[in-house]
Regions:
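Family-specific signature for flavin-dependent thymidylate synthase
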Residues: 1-182
């Protein structure tokens, strides 16, 4: 599996959203301070603030099992997926019989996602109840963020399963890492 990340819209466009919510000049385009950006990503209770939605990433995932992509495309808020087609009319493709295609066939996907939605997705996909293969994809995404700048590192550090934020598990059958929901 190979993961690459490209930031399409940077944190400088978050400043206008921050200022709009405070009733200030929303036409300002400048990077927020690291402290402000971290407060937006790592707020109390693990819920990122809405201006973080202004930051947009394009994530490329290659050679991932088809069934793993299905786990990701379940997310639909703040994200747009582009997954390799299994259509029968793609004759130059070795996977021409859609009905015979195995779920473990390795395919590629790409998705555009805002930083807020990425943090929400990470909560579900880093949970120990997620399949190891699904967790591996999210871990690779998180690792790639650490290869970016300080802003990307903040997003990467904020990517945690729910038990990392709440110290409780909300799964019907928890893994046992923390106590179940009250």
């Amino acid at each position: 599996m190979k993961v690459k990340i490209k930031r399409l819209v940077g944190p400088e466009y978050m400043t206008g959203a921050l200022r709009a919510t405070a009733g200030k000049d929303m036409y300002v385009v400048k990077k927020p301070t690291m402290k402000t950006f971290k407060q937006m990503a790592v707020s109390a209770g693990g819920v990122p603030h809405s201006p973080l939605r202004a930051v947009l990433y394009r994530i490329y995932v290659e050679d991932v099992k088809s069934w793993v992509t299905v786990h990701y495309v379940r997310h639909h808020i703040g994200v747009q997926f582009y997954v390799k087609s299994q259509r029968d009319d793609r004759k130059n493709d070795p996977m021409v019989d859609r009905g015979a295609a195995r779920q473990d066939t390795e395919i590629s996907m790409m998705f555009d996602i805002n930083a807020n939605s990425l943090l929400t997705m990470a909560q579900a996909r880093l949970c120990l109840k997620a399949s190891p293969e699904t967790r591996d994809v999210m871990k690779a995404i998180k690792h790639q963020l650490f290869e970016g700048d300080e802003y990307d590192e903040i997003v990467g550090n904020a990517m945690q399963p729910p038990c990392g934020w709440y110290e409780k598990c909300f799964e019907p059958q928890p893994c046992g890492k923390v106590k179940n929901r009250s």
